[in-house]
């Protein structure tokens, strides 16, 4: 069986998300490394919260990276095999690149904190938003967003193509509101505003891409030891400078998740393991391709369960 690992991004965090594996030595070491890299107690933040602090993007990004890497290290320490290919949803791509040996964890933790700060500062809080659109095809969502942009005078774009009939839009708050109205009129089953602080992956985040470019120039990237399919081009890259460029563009470009899972299927992947808190990506997998199974590894019990099937 060919299997892949995928790493979740923002939105899957929860207080206590590492409790079941926190006594594992490799997990304790990961938490210690993250705390030293940030100069604050990451283990305490994850274990105790509060949820409001965990949901601030400047905290969410480093703690979700830490959680994804902790679960991956726990998997390997328990005797799990390395996957043939990996990917990560948005921030999760950084977790995948750490697991693939491209970025050291020590460098990645402050990098994603910087990414979060750059993304948040690109658009003033309260002026941008996101919404999940359910029940329409991608082409309709793209077309209606263009109409909403024209009608409102603000930017609104499709930014996460997560599964058939599940697209996330982002942009200026008024434009997102207008798009939700028009999308409901066009037949959307639901248009749900998301509790986020910035219009992630929209072109409004171009200033964040520029800042990231400067920061990434100072960090050493290595050739990956495991293939990683990137969000922005749905490509497997080996050249470290090309990987950096893809991450720069990723901040202000859509996450092409449906295509990512389909690309894995083309490579013969039959099982996708979601490595980290939550079960969102595992749930999306079957909806994208019914020949591929999605299984989550989000606690000690699920780790052992999946390990037994993939050893």
Predicted regions and their residues:
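Cys-dependent protein tyrosine phosphatase-like superfamily
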Residues: 1-4, 221-231, 236, 245-249, ...
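Alpha/beta catalytic cores of group-transfer enzymes, especially the acyltransferase/condensing modules
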Residues: 10-12, 38, 100-252
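FabD-like malonyl-/acyl-CoA
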Residues: 1-141, 194, 271-301, 305
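Non-catalytic positions within long, well-ordered alpha-helices that form the structural scaffold/packing
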Residues: 76, 184, 265-268
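Short, solvent-exposed amphipathic alpha-helical segments in soluble enzyme
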Residues: 22-23, 147-149, 184-186, 287-290, ...
């Amino acid at each position: 069986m060919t299997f892949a690992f995928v790493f979740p991004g923002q939105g899957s965090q929860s207080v206590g998300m590492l409790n079941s594996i926190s006594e594992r030595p490799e997990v304790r070491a990961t938490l210690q490394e993250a705390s030293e890299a940030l100069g604050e107690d990451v283990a305490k933040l994850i274990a105790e919260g509060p949820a409001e602090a965990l949901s601030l993007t400047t905290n969410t990004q480093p703690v979700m990276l830490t959680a994804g890497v902790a679960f991956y290290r726990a998997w390997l320490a328990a005797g799990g095999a390395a996957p043939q290919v990996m990917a990560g949803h948005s921030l999760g791509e950084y977790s995948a690149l750490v697991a693939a040996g491209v970025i050291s964890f020590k460098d990645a933790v402050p990098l994603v904190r910087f990414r979060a700060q750059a993304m948040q500062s690109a658009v003033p809080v309260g002026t941008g938003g996101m919404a999940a659109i359910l029940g329409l095809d991608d082409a309709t969502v793209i077309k209606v967003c263009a109409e909403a942009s024209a009608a409102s005078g603000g930017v609104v774009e499709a930014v996460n193509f997560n599964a058939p009939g599940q697209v996330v839009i982002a942009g200026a708050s008024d434009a997102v509101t207008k798009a939700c109205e028009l999308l409901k009129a066009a037949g959307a089953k639901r248009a749900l505003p998301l509790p986020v602080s910035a219009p992630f992956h929209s072109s409004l985040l171009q200033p964040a891409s520029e800042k990231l470019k400067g920061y990434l120039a100072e960090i050493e990237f290595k050739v990956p030891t495991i293939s990683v399919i990137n969000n922005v081009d749905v490509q497997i890259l080996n050249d470290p400078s090309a990987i950096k460029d893809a991450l720069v563009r990723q901040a202000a470009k859509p996450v092409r998740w449906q295509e990512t899972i389909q690309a894995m299927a083309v490579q013969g992947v039959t099982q996708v393991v979601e490595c980290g808190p939550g079960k969102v990506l595992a749930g999306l997998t079957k909806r994208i391709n019914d020949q591929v199974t999605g299984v989550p590894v989000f606690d000690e019990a699920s780790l052992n369960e999946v390990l037994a099937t993939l050893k």
